[in-house]
């Protein structure tokens, strides 16, 4: 009996030590759980209207080179998407999608997902840019960049991760101070220092630019969708990053269409 108690205590201490030594909670980053939002969640998207086909300037990761990456011109189908709060977002779909009908399918798909996000994550966006390709998404410059064939954004074991990626990139646009977002650098950094742990390995690796975007998925999980993740993960998050959670709580976010408690 004593051996069992000692073994249990040792395992608990070892787990705690590993988290502290690693300094992050989730090794698989946001792919730890891709059920925070799903296609069953309400979307505030009201309608999408086609406007025109024209040449625009924007970002496309396929154009990146070893020497850098800059905006380029491409021809796009232009749609205006309207949401319940009156927000109108321009969705730009690359004409590589053959025709207006195919382009509208893409605009509808990602416009609906964007409409599932809480209002506070939709406060600083002007455009959504959609290309084909397997490159990673991006968020910043008042834009969300989508590559529809991004290889790691669907995980059969944990579900489709597209909604969680949309949350992540929208956090860059609407929350990151580096992109004119609503959060302030100093109190965030103070909260992070007090926590002493990052939410994910990715957040730790790129702490200056990814901590906010990685954290917000899990704030939404514990405050708005606690049944979407395991009780053990809820406990890890609440105990691991209490100061960041508190700072986010203090923002009094408009979380519609999600119902949140904090």
What are these regions (language model features)?
Residues 160, 178-199:
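Post-HEXXH active-site segment of zinc metalloproteases
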Residues 8-14:
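Bacterial N-terminal signal peptides
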């Amino acid at each position: 009996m004593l051996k069992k108690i000692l073994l249990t205590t040792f395992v608990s201490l070892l787990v705690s030590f590993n988290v502290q030594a690693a300094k992050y909670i989730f090794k698989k980053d946001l792919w730890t759980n891709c059920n925070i939002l799903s296609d069953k969640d309400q979307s505030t998207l009201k309608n999408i209207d086609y406007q025109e086909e024209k040449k625009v300037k924007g970002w496309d990761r396929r154009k990146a080179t070893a020497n850098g990456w800059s905006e380029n011109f491409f021809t796009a189908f232009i749609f205006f998407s309207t949401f319940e709060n009156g927000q109108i977002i321009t969705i730009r779909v690359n004409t590589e999608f053959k025709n207006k009908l195919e382009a509208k399918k893409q605009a509808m798909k990602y416009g609906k997902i964007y409409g599932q996000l809480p209002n506070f994550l939709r406060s600083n966006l002007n455009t959504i840019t959609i290309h084909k390709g397997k490159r990673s998404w991006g968020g910043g410059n008042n834009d969300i960049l989508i590559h529809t064939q991004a290889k790691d954004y669907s995980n059969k074991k944990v579900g489709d991760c597209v909604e969680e990626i949309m949350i992540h990139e929208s956090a860059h646009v609407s929350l990151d101070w580096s992109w004119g977002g609503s959060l302030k650098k100093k109190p965030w950094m103070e909260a992070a220092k007090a926590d002493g742990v990052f939410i994910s390995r990715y957040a730790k690796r790129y702490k200056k630019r990814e901590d906010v975007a990685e954290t917000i998925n899990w704030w939404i999980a514990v405050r708005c969708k606690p049944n979407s993740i395991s009780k053990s993960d809820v406990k890890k998050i609440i105990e691991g990053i209490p100061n960041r959670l508190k700072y986010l709580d203090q923002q009094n976010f408009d979380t519609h269409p999600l119902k949140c408690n904090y």
